[in-house]
Amino acid sequence: MLKAKNVSKTYNAGKKIALQDFSIEVPTGSVYGLLGPNGAGKTSFIRIINQITQADTGEIFINGEKLNPNHIKDIGYMPEERGLYKNMTVGDQLLYFGELKGMSKNHALEQAKYWFDQLEIDHWWKKKLSELSKGMAQKIQF
């Protein structure tokens, strides 16, 4: 279960309020969406959960535990903006992502090869990211 209590986040030295006393409970096994206009704080909240940025105030709990770095491995996040390096090969990009997640290069290689085999996309390994469609690039981020 995800529980957020009175989460607030500001930018520009407090001049821009992204979230103000935001609270939500998401029961285990459920699917929720965050809806709202631009600037409503949806992305800020997702980034706080993923520990990309920190809340100014409030608390977040995952299964009753205060949010901590150990939760990162259990949280998925695919940002709308692309975090891909177009001149890298698909394989190199995935190894880089694995290292960002704390995996050894060998373990990242093993996992990437496993999933390439499962998804039958072995032929993508040496392709440049710039050669992929937006949809295919999104799969690489996943």
What are these model-predicted stretches?
Residues 37-41:
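Walker A (P-loop) phosphate-binding loop of ABC-type ATPase nucleotide-binding domains
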Residues 1-4, 8-21, 28:
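A short, flexible loop at the N-terminus of ABC-type nucleotide-binding domains that lies
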Residues 50:
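Helix-to-loop junction immediately C-terminal to a conserved catalytic motif
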Residues 58-73:
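Conserved ABC transporter NBD signature motif
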